[in-house]
Amino acid sequence: MSKLSLSSLDKTNLEGKKVLVRVDFNVPLNEDGQITDDTRIRAAIPTIEYLINHSAKVILAAHFGRPKGQVNEKMRLTPVAARLSELLGQNVALTNSCIGDEAVAQSNSLSNGDVLLLENVRFFGEEEKNDLEFAKKLASHADMYVNDAFGAAHRAHASTQGVTNYLSPSVAGFLLEKELKYLQGAIDSPKRPLAAIVGGSKVSSKIGVLDSLLDKCDKIMIGGGMIFTFYKARGLDVGKSLVEEDKLELAKDLEAKAKAKGVELLLPTDVVLADEFSPDANSKISQIDSISGNWMGLDIGPDSIKVFQNALAECKTIIWNGPMGVFEFDKFADGTNAIATTLADLSAFSEVCTIIGGGDSVAAVEKAGLAEKMSHISTGGGASLELLEGKTLPGVAALNDA
């Protein structure tokens, strides 16, 4: 699905034009209202700077938190406007509301190269309902549209889909274009062997991905809390480890499917057990057939790490989604950190394409200080999963075809 991108527009298309850009500025704040991680803001800078440098008037639309269709003073974009001003080295004004006469007057008064941030679009319930009247009001700010919010591209909302009915051209920004290139490319035309590492606590949240990847991958490695549902389905004792009792048949089916399709499905052979869910818990390493009593598995074990590393060394494209254990606790972060280091090394020294597919695995890679070493780090959690599942993203489908 090839979409028109911002790179196809030059100064003749952009000079003096008001461009509505949907960005993903849903960043974490601490209790003092300060941004603790500005990755998403920095990710949008190339698109914004391209528009500034081509003399466009830039109008940014973003959501923040879940204000449930009402103004919530704690969810205003004030800290975002301040951080963006610092990163761009120019003032970014913030409107009091994303629609209305006052906001439109502000967008109409912009000079070429100016940047205006519209207040939180989710202060209006119509945003998430994809209300076309609301979309029309948002669109009235601008002459054309750029979607650079991959993290929200799986939502059919007014600012991601509705506005494209009223603005032309509607194109992909650089971040969205890069996400599609890597994630879609890894699924449609990867360098092989292709491996996926799927982690996280629940099979239920990764069913679609695992199912879809079984049709695409040469190898799949599974880690995280979800492994215990597979073990229990095999009839093993898992102690007090997390298990989704209603997904045991599904786990059996996935193993059978992998076998039938000739996909190498690797599950850990040993795990790190804890006597309680705590960073200071007593821990021990155990083979998967020796778990019992009050122990719970919180990480993959050292033997499994080696097996996974050897399997990954043979691959040319690797997608990673979900941690191997409770990496927030240092004691149970070894599996996740080892995978992160392995991928960074393969990326750097073996020209392997490494894609970190959103969510907790991104946090783990950043915590390990290895983000720069990966081929691609996805900014979208749900959007990455849906793309890997082979679903069409509404925010992408709505853009003009190339």
From Swiss-Prot:
Coiled coil: none annotated. It holds the Pfam family PGK. Pathway: Carbohydrate degradation; glycolysis; pyruvate from D-glyceraldehyde 3-phosphate: step 2/5. The keyword Kinase applies. Belongs to the phosphoglycerate kinase family. Monomer. This is Phosphoglycerate kinase. It comes from Prochlorococcus marinus (strain MIT 9312). The gene is pgk.
